Regions:
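Alpha-helix N-cap/helix-start capping motif
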Residues: 7-8, 48, 94-95
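A short beta-to-alpha transition loop/helix N-cap that caps and shapes the active-site region
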Residues: 36, 123-124
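Glycine-/Pro-rich loop/turn segments that contact NAD(P) or position catalytic residues
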Residues: 27-84, 102
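Glycine- and other small-residue-rich loops at beta-strand/loop junctions that grip anionic moieties
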Residues: 3, 43, 90
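Rossmann-like NAD(P)-binding element
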Residues: 1-25, 30-38
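Glycine-rich, phosphate-binding/catalytic loops in enzymes
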Residues: 18-20, 43-45, 107
């Protein structure tokens, strides 16, 4: 499993050769921002969601989008609180890959919430 911790502005530098094929699970944490400041625009990926765009560039890899709705400080801290566990949304088109990511989120202490496939869930995130 590969967790992609870069911002969307780093998409061009994804290690494509290492991540293609072989059924590797890639956790896409990015957003479509063209700059660190989201008010400066988004990458134009046409009708695709950002994760669908990433999936097209990584044939054979199993993409699961997660962590992109949280600031780093919320990910780094303990997600278990007196009020309950912090939620992390995830989405993907491969059921086994999603199950693996959900298990990892649970192990980290997060409450994992499945938003469906990359198309539907990606648009919600």
């Amino acid at each position: 499993m590969y967790l992609e911790p870069r911002p969307g502005i780093a998409w061009p530098s994804l290690p494509l050769r290492e991540l293609k094929g072989a059924g590797k699970i890639v956790v896409d944490t990015t957003n479509q921002f063209a700059a660190a400041n989201p008010w400066r625009g988004r990458y134009d990926v046409g009708d695709l969601t950002g994760s669908e765009w990433v999936a097209e560039r990584l044939p054979g890899a199993r993409i699961v989008k997660a962590f992109n709705t949280l600031f780093a400080a919320f990910i780094a801290g303990d997600p278990r609180h007196e009020e309950g566990r912090q939620a992390v949304f995830y989405a993907g088109d491969d059921a086994d890959a999603k199950a693996a990511v959900a298990a990892l989120l649970d192990e980290f202490g997060f409450a994992a919430l499945d938003l469906g496939g990359l198309r539907e869930g990606g648009r919600l995130m």
